[in-house]
Amino acid sequence: GTIASGKLSIKQKVKVLPSGFEARINKIFESDKEINQAYKMQAITFTLDDHIDLSRGDFIVDTNNPCDLSDQFRVDLIWMDVNHFLPGRTYIIKMECRTLKAKIFIKYKYDIENFKKNMSKILKLNDIASCDMIFETKIVYENYEVNKTLGSFIVIDPDSNATCGAGRINFALRRSSNLIFQNLD
């Protein structure tokens, strides 16, 4: 794979996300040449000191500097399709080497003439909006300002397979998992 950020070194302790398994880097190869370290945007192959099942779309992170996982995000989205955006519809999201499903809900649309925030239920061609995006599962991410590779995505129409939008992750929505319903009667 390609290193999205940081570096990998021989004997470095890493974590596989989203599974959480840990191992150490055993060997690193660039083309057919064995190397000791690899850096951002370098395409490499590596081996681990343990047998861990890795799948396309898994991430290898340093155990001392792990990425966050979330399934809900505030994003900026530009709509690039003549067919209007349908809020709450499940769209296909392509991020780096991952293909996922998510629902997108508009918070507000930007008026590109004066940058005011306007309420809207639809997006038309070339509209830009702030949206909440909810994935079917937790994903590894970084905000676009930190890492453009892990913080950007394209939106694909599930019926036509056409690219209909593109966007960037601004931040994760921290929803509590320990909320308890309170009867107010």
Task: List each language-model region with its residue ranges.
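C-terminal effector/interaction modules appended to NTPase cores
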Residues: 1-185
